[in-house]
Amino acid sequence: QAIRAVTSLPALTGAWRHVGGGILQFPVWEHPYKFDVICRPDLIPEGTQVVNNLQLGRVLTGEQKLNVPIKSMMCWNTNPVTQATESEKILEGLKREDLFLVSAEHFISDTAAFADILLPASMGAEQEDMILSWGHLYLTYNSKCVESPGECLPNNEIFRQLAKRLGYEEENFKWSDSECLENY
């Protein structure tokens, strides 16, 4: 809500009419990153349904139909209830009895509160990663500084363990964090 309030100020004050008085804009096309390399669409099997966060509420409520409806979902690095559009529809969809939700989170967020399974995820200083910043155009290396407390795991490790339990044998599911960074 804070972001919405701040980005409304230029409209409320009329500042948008003056050079430099507009809203904060950081469009994805300004990034010098090669998203097709970072996101590795070549690893997504052909025919896989992809749902954007902007469509999530409509998909979860059945307003927007998919070939195969979502019966289970895993959320990590996102809190759709507060970060996506149509929050009320997302809340309605998360309340479905037939939806199995897993959330990897640091805290019990608005979305994680609906999780059937809540996994303790590590924080930035506790994992090696590459970070796309919202404040500049650099791709930044994040080195691991401290060990994660308790049972917290980096997302990559959660997915490695999940892939192993589900029987995935592809090499990319076995990559270490460093290998993931090298191959992306």
Model-flagged regions — what are they?
Residues 1-2, 66-67, 151-153:
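Structural motif
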Residues 2-11, 162:
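Basic, amphipathic alpha-helical segments enriched in Lys/Arg and hydrophobic/aromatic residues
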Residues 7-114, 122-130, 142:
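Extended redox/cofactor-interaction regions of prokaryotic respiratory oxidoreductases
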